[in-house]
Amino acid sequence: MKPAVIVLHGPTSAGKSSLARALQDIAPVPAFHVALDAFVTMSRRRDMRSPEEVQQAYHLHCENLRSVLARVVDSQFEILVDLVLRDESELQNTLRVLSGRPMYLVGVQAPVEVLEERESHREDRGGGMAREQSTNPAFRRNYDLVIDTSTHSPEGGAIAIRNFVREHPRHGNPSGNAA
């Protein structure tokens, strides 16, 4: 059986990337960290001249993410997916690509004040994104597990996720939360 997919889903500045790196550090097998942000940085939003261009770039980023995930899913690596997707159809399409593996959907959250504080220290984030995203219904779903990064360090969150995966083994297709 191939290793699991752990999907880290939450608003900007919640700590998904830090959590993914901590998960890699204690992974039982080599783990790929695939983040939507890696594709988003291929374009600069300020260069977009219309809402249509922004939307076209967003869909291209999501398609590129799914294309890479489709290749990695055929490997023997564990997959750590770092997503801020709010569009339900894009999220479901992405999860569907991963559906041949045991999958765990982990909500990564923190109080809005913590998100805003973290956001203020990031050069790659505009102000207000954390507040807007924290109230989005996309992040109020039934997750397999929720990690509050205001009360868990990345290492502590990674241990909690690893314990959950070990205590709730899955084979093949994901839970009803995923695809």
Please report, for each region that a protein language model flagged, where it lies by residue.
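Conserved phosphate-donor/acceptor-positioning beta-strand/loop module used by diverse small-molecule
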Residues: 99-120, 147
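Glycine-rich phosphate-binding loop used to anchor ATP phosphates in small-molecule kinases
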Residues: 57-102, 109
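Conserved lysine of the Walker
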Residues: 16
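Pre-Walker A (Motif I) flank of P-loop NTPase domains
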Residues: 2-5, 77
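Small-molecule kinase domains that catalyze NTP-dependent phosphoryl transfer to phosphate-bearing small molecules
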Residues: 118-162, 167-179
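Hydrophobic anchor at the beta1->P-loop junction of P-loop NTPases
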Residues: 8
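Conserved substrate/cofactor phosphate-moiety recognition/catalytic segment
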Residues: 21-64
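Walker A (P-loop) phosphate-binding loop of P-loop NTPases
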Residues: 13
